[in-house]
A protein has these predicted regions:
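Short, solvent-exposed secondary-structure boundary motifs
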Residues: 63-69, 99-106
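Short, low-complexity N-terminal intrinsically disordered segments enriched in polar/charged residues
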Residues: 1-14, 18, 22, 26, ...
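Eukaryotic helix-grip
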Residues: 78, 84-92, 103-110, 127-135
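Glycine-centered flexibility motif
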Residues: 51, 107-109, 154
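Hydrophobic/aromatic beta-strand elements that line small-molecule binding cavities or substrate pockets
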Residues: 73-79, 108-117
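Terminal "cap-and-tail" regions of soluble proteins that handle hydrophobic small molecules
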Residues: 2-10, 98-104, 114-156
């Protein structure tokens, strides 16, 4: 099912953005770990999340209660693989709307991934670091602005 890292990373974006947390938890190993490095005060996450179910809950279910129309994009289709099981400094961009005040959010940062090969040959995520460098809050813009931005970019 998840035989290569590129496919797995596309599934990560789709399941996270579309609030499919039950599917998202299946792409992480049960004892997976997600850590955060956040260089902005406009968004917050716990310092670390342990376990695939908790990861899916925070990154998908809880996140999608606060934001909607979430779309995450990889800034390059060339994944910077260090080896078969590690991808480092994968640039990303997210465009979404905050439900509470309808402000548009635009953020960017880096992902680092470590994968584990399973007995069945599939890859799963064992460690994931999310660095958030910028998270702009753009209040007062019409919803059409969000749609226009998202329509210009290939998803995921």
């Amino acid at each position: 099912m998840y035989k290569n890292a590129e496919y797995l990373l596309e599934k990560y974006v789709e399941e996270k953005d579309q609030d499919k947390f039950k599917i998202l938890e299946k792409i992480y190993v049960p004892n997976a770990k997600v850590t955060f490095e956040i260089d902005t005060d406009t968004i917050s996450f716990p310092t670390e999340i342990l376990g695939n179910k908790n990861i899916a809950q925070v990154l998908s279910a809880e996140f999608n209660r606060k934001y909607d129309h979430v779309q995450t994009y990889y800034l390059s289709r060339s994944f910077p693989q260090i080896n078969d099981f590690t991808i480092s400094n994968q640039g990303w961009l997210v465009i979404m709307r905050e439900k509470e005040d309808n402000s548009i959010r635009v953020g960017t940062g880096l992902y680092d991934w470590i994968f584990e090969k399973q007995v069945d040959g599939n890859l799963k995520i064992s460690q994931h670091n999310i660095s958030i460098g910028v998270m702009l809050c753009l209040p007062g813009l019409p919803f059409s602005f969000l749609n226009e931005l998202q329509s210009k970019l290939p998803y995921p």
